[in-house]
Structure formats: C-alpha cells, structure tokens
Amino acid sequence: MTSRERVLSTLSHREPDRVPIDFGSTGVTGVHVSCIAGLRDYFGLEKRLVKAHEPYQMLGILDEDLKQAMGVDVEGVSRPKTLFGYRNRDWKPWRMPDGLEVLVSEEFRVTTDANGDILIYPEGDMSAPPSGRMPKDGYFFDTIIRQEPIVEEKLDPQDNLEEFKPLTDADIEDLRQGVNEAQRTGRAAIMNVGGTAFGDIALVPAPFLKHPKGIRDVAEWYVSTSSRRDYIHQIFSRQCDIAIDNLTRVHQAIGDAVDAIFVCGTDFGTQTSAFCSVKTFRELYFPYYKTLNGWIHEHTTWKTFKHSCGSVERFLQSFIEGGFDFLNPVQCSATGMDASHLKTTYGDRVTFWGGGIDTQQVLPFGTPEEVHTQVLERCRIFSRNGGYVFNTIHNVQARTPVKNIVAMLDAVREFVG
C-alpha cells in the first residue's frame, strides 16, 4: 500500500498493511524543534538547522528525509502563518535559551525583558504590545493576556469576530499550492483552513492580533459561556457562516484533493474532569459543529478532525453525532479514557488519531523498554479493524529523550511487521 492508501483504508475502518503514522501534519501532532534536531542526528541525516514553523509551541518542520526515516504517512497543508500572526518566510537563525540554534521567519521579532524572559510581538510589529512570553529557561511561548476593561453595556460580539474573516485570494492560492505539494508526496493530506474552531481557548487571547478587543481573558471567556451565553451564540453563529463561505471557496479551488480537514482544537476535558457539562456542550457548541461538519460531509469527501485534550469520554457520543470522524489526541492518561473501553465502545464509529504513547510520563521519563511496551499495547488495542492513526498523545515535548522516541518508532514498526 502507498501511504495514502494505508490511511484511507484505516479511515474506512479496514485494517491496512500496517498502522499509519502521523508526525508533523498538524499543530497538535507535531514535534518540538529540539527533538527534531536530535532525531536528525540519530538517523545520520544532513546537518541543517530545524525550521520552527510554529513558535507558540516551538514545533519544527519535519523535512522529507526525516519523514521517510520515521515512516510518516500523513502530510499537512495550512496557510504559512503562525499563531503570532506573522508569515513564515525568509528564514534566519535564532538561538533558544538552552543554546539550540534554529531557523525562524524573518518576521519573527523578539526582545528580552529585565527578567531575561523573551517577548514576541504580533505580526512582528514591535510597536504593538508583546503577545507571547518564553521564560528565560523555557522551551516555548506562553500567551500574554491583553484584556481591556470590560464594560458590560458596550460588549460587541463583532469584537470577538475580528480574526474571522473571508479568506483572501492569496490565502486560497497558498492552500492550493500546499495541496499540490502534498499530493506529490504520495501521503494522505490533512488541511487546516483556520476559523473553524468554536471557542478554542488557545485562540481566544488572539496572540496574532495587535490590539485584541472583546473578551480575551481565559477565565472571563469560560465565565461568559455561562453568564453571557447569548453573546457567545452570536459569535459562533457568525463564525460558522464565515467558515462555510471560506470552505466553499477552498473546495472550489482544490476539490477533494485532500483527505481530511482539521476542524476544531477546542479542549473540553481536563486531566480528571471537563470544562463544561454535556448539556452545555449540546446547547452551546453542538449546533455549530453539526452545521459545519454537515456542510463538509454534504459537499466534500473530506473527513473531519476533532482535537480535545483530557477526559472527554462523556462527550464522544456528541462528537460523533456532531459529525466528527476523528478524535485526537486520545489522552488515555485522563480519567475515563481507558484505551480498551474507548475502542470497544466507539471504535466502529470514530477513528482514533493519537493515543499511542503517554507524553506526560512514559515517553519523556520512562525507559525505552517501558515506551516499547506501551506502544505495542496501544497499537494492539486501537488498530483492530482499522480506525487508527498512530501518534503520540499531543505533541512530542522538549527534552524528550531521543532514545525513547526511537524506541517508540521501533515498536510501531515491530507491530506492523
């Protein structure tokens, strides 16, 4: 099987010749730049600096030689903009606090504050307040909350819609070119158009905007889902309309040349509980996901990707009814997320994309033998009758031992033959 055939087989809940593997196709299935550098050294690949394409989590680009060495079957397509609003182009070297030199966009602009922390600026505009902070001994950027005082009677949903706009012709062309490049790899393609996630808390503070208005504080947003529900409904309703208009234009440009679309990264689970009740999810979020995914399934062949960390078993039936085809990252370490239970209960109706290894404890802190054992067990559980794409539980974090990453890859290869 080709990589694409392998992925399409598992998405149709048929067992392929081996378990498909994804690393680097999305912002939630990626690898930290430091780990990519270590893997390149391990595999004896050409010496080159790693490109940090998403500074928020310091995720790096996996070049073709590394993808082949890792056995990657999925190719990502997205617009070349970062979470801090600047475009990836004209790469330049930059040294991280731990001394690792990487490549960043020419539009990447940072300063260092009195504490030694690194501040990053939206759209690379240093006349605007910084929107992200990397601690002096850190490995990625945290969003800086820039919440203006809230005057209740002046709240305007349009302020929280500033980032949801019609795609430009240049945006469409970026995606079209990306799709063409993905097709040439022979891998399955997953696309992220943007603007389709309702209430994604990573996006609420808008680190990509110079002067965000509306409700941008994380705690205030969660409070608003209860106390200002009409306000949130107005945002989601308009956002849904804009998203469908954008997807219509994208589909006109690329047709069914991609196999899946990243729809949503909104987290509904915590380690032990949830951010809202199922009732709140059904009332506030479900109608818009149902509408958006319904349009996708009616007008395209694209499969739909739902990311939600944490304990989300209680939401899975609603996710499925809302039109989601995949669940990621499948956080088996969270309460109620036992791998066998998930596969037995939902495995014929949803594809599990992730869950392959615990990135909180086992991958970063376990032994290679412990990594190997858990990967084989997860593959055995999740791959039965297809419906499984191997990935870690969320991104591979900084300081993860390369020997453990290699043990993980070796175990997947061993399982598949």
Region spans (language model):
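Short secondary-structure boundary micro-motifs
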Residues: 5, 76, 92-95, 102-103, ...
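Segments that shape or occlude catalytic/ligand-binding pockets
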Residues: 35-85
